[in-house]
UniProtKB/Swiss-Prot annotation:
Domain Pyrin per the UniProt entry, residue ranges: 1-87
Record domain HIN-200: where: 219-416
Record-linked Gene3D superfamilies: Death Domain, Fas, Nucleic acid-binding proteins
Annotated Gene Ontology cellular component terms: nucleus
Organism: Mus musculus (Mouse)
Biased composition (Basic and acidic residues): 220-229
Keywords linked to the UniProt accession: Nucleus
Bias kind Basic residues: ranges: 87-102
Family: Belongs to the HIN-200 family.
Record-given protein name: Pyrin and HIN domain-containing protein 1
Length: 420
């Protein structure tokens, strides 16, 4: 039960909030968790481990509920935590009741052997009415008739009149006058196999792949699709782009970013197990499962969440979808977007200004200018006006006066030097 509570704490409580709120939660829980200076840099997974040790009863679910009710904007998550905890309790209680009921049902069956004597069988047959006997006979008879129709279609077609009269006679015999039975749907509407559909499409001269592709190309998404919370189902995707692993905190924890796509949408992915770098190869098809959606990203923490696909079925990713997933957004487009989204792209550096704890770059394109604030480890990367910056996972911060990009914990950037 504690493991279930920890799942709620991590996937709903900690992964469901942004980085700013997470730092606030760590600060408010620092005394209870007795965080030292190094532990102040712990990520969500490690904080969940500490909470499990500190609050063995419920892994800290109640503590998060109390905190989130006091933090503006987190009331909905507090209610969600409360509901999921109640649901976990009900599930646990239901499993106990089911186990007890199954145990009670098994006890008499083991103590009383089944009787097969004629004395026990005769009273049962004596209670059967003519109607029930007809109903009992009708099922095997109809089953044999169904088998006859399905197994020998040539015989039925060669003697159509005889089959018609026989089926009508048999129909009148097996049907009860009180409760007439409808014929099986498998007889009336024979299933259409994939081979039949394929041959029909080919007869029209239009390949199925072309039809599906045309349907997929109608609406090409401009933004990555988002999923929220823990996702246990599987998703078949193709890898479009992947970065090299990099250290993202003072404890030298490593991760890498990737862009993947289905045939209709694309996703941004954060991978926190660098062993998976061997599987994330461009144009490779993978199945991902048991992941967490948060802040517009799919977060993968375990190698067991990714498996290679070798079913021989190719994925046809439209070229327009590939271009959309790799496109650098225009600055005027970013200025019109809601704040809080994360941005990838290559931008030209027009100006550089070093502040006391960060570097401010001014980037530009043919639609406008925008500031980029770079903090922490990324300030050590040498970049000058005229160079290009490849930004990965930079946040469009809330600012009423002007749009601005800012680096976060999982941001990274690369410099493309200007040609002399």
């Amino acid at each position: 039960m504690v493991n279930e509570y920890k799942r709620i704490v991590l996937l709903t409580g900690l992964m469901g909030i942004n980085d700013h709120d997470f730092r606030m939660v760590k600060s408010l829980l620092s005394k209870e968790l007795k965080l030292n200076r190094m532990q102040d840099q712990y990520d969500r997974v490690k904080i969940a481990d500490l909470m499990e040790d500190k609050f063995p009863k419920d892994a800290g679910v109640d503590q998060l509920i109390k905190l989130y009710k006091q933090i503006p904007g987190l009331g909905d998550i507090a209610n969600k935590l409360k509901n999921e905890k109640a649901k976990a309790k009900r599930t646990r209680t239901g499993k106990r009741k089911t186990a007890a009921k199954r145990q009670r049902q098994e006890e008499p069956s083991t103590s009383q052997p089944m009787s097969t004597t004629n004395e026990d069988a005769e009273p049962e047959s004596g209670r059967s009415t003519p109607d029930t006997q007809v109903a009992q006979l009708s099922l095997p008879t109809a089953s044999r008739r169904n088998q006859a129709i399905q197994i020998s279609p040539t015989i039925a077609s060669s003697s159509g009149q005889t089959s018609s009269r026989s089926s009508e006679t048999l129909q009148s015999i097996i049907q009860s006058p009180k409760t007439p039975k409808r014929p099986s749907s498998s007889i009336l509407d024979p299933p259409v196999s994939s081979g039949t559909a394929s041959s029909s499409a080919q007869a029209l001269g239009v390949p199925l792949a072309t039809i599906a592709k045309r349907q997929r190309l109608k609406n090409v998404p401009k933004e990555p699709s988002e999923e929220n919370g823990h996702q246990q189902g599987s998703k078949k995707v193709m890898v479009l782009k992947v970065t090299e692993p990099f250290s993202y905190d003072v404890t030298e924890e490593k991760m890498f970013h990737a862009t993947v796509a289905t045939e209709t949408e694309f996703f941004r992915v954060k991978v926190f197990d660098i062993v998976l770098k061997e599987k994330f190869i461009p144009n490779k098809v993978l199945t991902i499962s048991n992941y967490v959606g948060c802040n517009g990203f799919i977060n993968i923490y375990s190698a067991s969440s990714v498996s290679e696909v070798n079913d021989g079925e190719p994925m046809n990713i439209p070229l327009s979808l590939r271009k959309s997933a790799n496109r650098t957004p225009k600055i005027n487009y970013l200025c019109s977007k809601k704040r809080g989204i994360f941005v990838n792209g290559v931008f030209t550096v027009c100006k550089k200004e070093e502040k006391w704890n960060y570097i401010c770059y001014e980037i530009g394109d043919d639609t406008g200018m925008m500031e980029v604030e770079v903090y922490g480890r990324l300030t050590n990367i040498a970049c000058n006006p005229g160079d290009k910056l490849r930004l990965i996972c930079f946040k469009l911060i809330p600012d009423e006066e002007k749009a601005q990009l800012r680096s976060t914990t999982h941001s990274n950037m690369q410099v493309i030097k200007a040609k002399n």
